[in-house]
UniProtKB/Swiss-Prot annotation:
It is found in: Nucleus, Nucleolus. GO terms for biological process: ribosome biogenesis. This is Nucleolar GTP-binding protein 1. Its main location: nucleus. PANTHER family: NUCLEOLAR GTP-BINDING PROTEIN 1. Involved in the biogenesis of the 60S ribosomal subunit. GTP binds at residues 174-181, 220-224, 288-291. It comes from the Eukaryota. Residues 568-643 are annotated as: Disordered. One of its GO terms (molecular function) is GTP binding.
Length: 643
């Protein structure tokens, strides 16, 4: 439950709100548009202006509506207090006006955005934008009075004390100038103004103190006059609502010296007038200023008049003097005790908590069967005969705590957690049992009959081996086939395996060539060895061609000269013939036309990179479009050269 409203955002006046939103639109949206631009760009430019302005107003209105409390959702004490201070209907009407303005601004934004979609020129779009912002400004200007009122309410709400209606509370009330604020200053650290005249306190003041490690709040209320509630002003009604709504101990202060300006008869009469507000509350009458006059010093008539307040059930009278701080703490402690006792009594009287606990409890009772047998609870014989534990019995079963004390106490004696294990041999209790062995969970292989099962498996394995279960005769595989058929099957199997290997290799080669440039088949270089292999596979005799190739090779062989003899010792391993150095730029190109075409394409590809000053195809560096040292703070007229 919200108890204070100190975080409500400031409510700007209508003109200031208008300036804030319009300046924000001008700063955060583009400002340059020209008639030569595409019409869709012009429409988008002005639609953005309208939408941004509408969203700015809606955002401000939302902050106002969400910041202020909903007067119907707060505690009745706060609701009546706000009604007294701010006039509930006026408060609701002001918030409703803001909510209505928000709806109208949203509607204007939607309507003019729809119209801007069909704008035909820059001038038309500009006029539509101007009309939209003008209508929004008119709506905001009509909120002049509600916004001023809400700002005043916000300031007052921020100064209101934080009062918790459900905590332990001492409520101080009575006629003006009877010492209420002085008592609050004595028992708390609240800085309350104290003056020797009436109606010094015009609002509720709260102080906090501790009693028996519990937090209490004491509330000083404005003075009340004995008159009908219809004639009471806002200051007095604050006290009435506090007494009516807060669960507290009411401390009614009286001044027997009559220096407050009111007689004892008037003070007693006021007590009986507000007596209906004391229902379900503990009440204490505190007689203040006993340093001037005490109850014993009154005449008999006034004593009898004072005793009439005791006719109310549960009322006690105590005396104190705040000026001399006499009996102040005793009065405070007595009021706290009465409050704590009444709160405990109310808790015991309320059946809600008991009902909530009883709803969670269910006692299961066995239902009678058709045969009529009474099913009594079953108690095992060992449990029934079990002897009750008696600490004085010397033959009693020792508890773990007693064993610990006998062996040195906590920190010296360690409890053996394996002592209660049920095993065949008690010596096994303290054996080290690994949890993980060879990467496997040991508990997965635990079995009381594991040795018997292992022996049965070994016997079955020996029996299968002796029967020849695992033996495999190759002749049985080809049973029903003669030798020629078996040989043919094996040859086919060998051919299939070889064919599968070739297919796998061919697939791998295709994948390897996927990302490489391909040459047309007609342009690929062919060697004599490839032709010989292909023709031989087709069944042609290549002997004559081999002889011709050998003769051609002899003619092309490099003839050794005298220079080769002179410089031959300079190289350890001279080649059999000179190898011609090839040009890698032209190796992959078939003829001159293809070469010129490739050069033109390469030149076009380099042109874009050169224009953008790229180092290569992989250069993706994005340079600053506006270098700060060239553009920061520079103005054309030369007025400013830095920010």
């Amino acid at each position: 439950m919200q108890l204070s409203w100190k975080d409500i955002p400031t409510v700007a006046p209508a003109n200031d709100l208008l300036d804030i939103v319009l300046n924000r639109t001008q700063r955060k949206t583009p400002t340059v548009i020209r008639p030569g631009f595409n019409i869709t760009r012009i429409r988008a430019f002005y639609m953005r202006k309208v939408k941004f302005t509408g969203e700015g107003f809606v955002e401000k209105f939302d902050d106002i509506l969400k910041g202020f409390p909903n007067i119907n959702d707060v505690h009745p004490f706060h609701r009546d207090l706000m009604d007294t201070l701010y006039e509930k209907n006026h408060f609701k009407v002001s918030l409703a006006a803001v909510s209505r303005a928000k709806t109208l601004v949203e509607q204007v934004e939607r309507d003019y955005t729809r119209l801007l979609k069909f704008g035909q020129s820059l001038f038309q779009c500009k006029q539509l934008k101007r009309a939209a912002l003008g209508r929004m400004a008119t709506i905001v200007k009509k909120l002049k009075d509600p916004l001023v009122y809400l700002e005043q309410v916000r300031q007052h709400l921020g100064r209101m004390p934080s009062i918790d209606p459900n905590t332990r509370t001492l409520l101080i009330c009575g006629y003006p100038n009877v010492g209420k604020s002085s008592f609050l200053r004595c028992i708390t650290k609240a800085d309350v103004e104290v003056q020797p005249y009436a109606f010094t306190t015009k609002s509720l003041y709260v102080g906090h103190f501790d009693y028996k490690y519990l937090r209490f709040q004491a509330i000083d209320t404005p003075g009340i006059l004995d008159r009908p509630t219809d004639e009471m002003n806002n200051v007095e009604m604050q006290s009435i609502y506090a007494i009516a709504h807060l669960r507290s101990t009411v401390m009614y202060f009286m001044d027997l010296s009559e220096q407050c300006g009111f007689s004892i008869e008037a003070q007693v009469k006021l007590f009986h007038s507000i007596k209906p507000l004391f229902a379900n509350k503990s009440v204490m009458v505190v007689i203040n200023k006993t340093d001037i006059i005490k109850p014993e010093d009154l005449d008999e008539e006034r004593k009898k008049l004072l005793d009439t307040v005791l006719e109310v059930p549960g009322v006690e009278i105590m005396t104190t003097s705040c000026h001399e701080e006499d009996n102040v703490m005793a009065v405070r402690n007595k009021a706290c005790e009465k409050l704590l006792a009444s709160r405990i009594e109310n808790k015991l009287k309320s059946q809600a908590r008991i009902t909530n606990v009883l709803n969670k409890i269910h006692v299961a009772q066995p239902q009678k069967r058709d045969d009529g047998i009474d099913r009594t609870p079953y108690i095992p014989e060992a449990i029934a005969k079990m002897k009750k534990y008696d600490p004085e019995d010397p033959n009693r079963r020792k508890l773990a705590k007693e064993i610990e004390i006998e062996n040195g106490g906590a920190g010296v004696y360690n409890v053996n957690l394996k002592d209660k294990y049920l095993l065949e041999d008690d010596e096994w209790k303290n054996d080290v049992m690994p949890e993980i062995l060879d990467g496997k969970n040991v508990y997965d292989f635990l079995d009381p009959e594991i040795a018997i099962k292992l022996q049965a498996l070994e016997e079955e394995e020996e029996r299968l081996e002796s029967e020849g279960f695992y033996e495999s005769d190759e002749e049985e595989t080809y049973e029903g086939f003669d030798a020629d058929e078996i040989s043919e099957i094996r040859e086919k199997a060998e051919w299939i395996r070889d064919r599968q290997k070739k297919m796998i290799n061919a697939s791998r080669n295709r994948k390897a060539l996927k990302n490489r440039g391909t040459m047309p088949r007609s342009k690929l270089a062919k060697t004599y060895g490839d032709m010989e292999k292909h023709m031989s596979s087709l069944g042609h005799d290549m002997t004559a061609l081999q002889d011709k190739q050998r003769v051609a090779a002899e003619k092309n062989r490099y003839e050794q000269t005298g220079a080769d003899v002179v410089y031959g010792d300079q190289e350890d391993s001279a080649p059999a013939g000179k190898l011609r150095q090839t040009d890698r730029l032209t190796d992959g190109v078939a003829d001159g036309s293809m070469r010129s075409k490739a050069e033109r394409m390469a030149k076009l590809e380099r042109r874009e990179r050169n224009r953008m000053a790229r180092a290569g195809e992989s250069d993706r560096h994005a340079t600053a479009s506006l270098p700060k040292h060239l553009f920061s703070g520079k103005r054309g007229v030369g007025k400013t050269d830095f920010r």
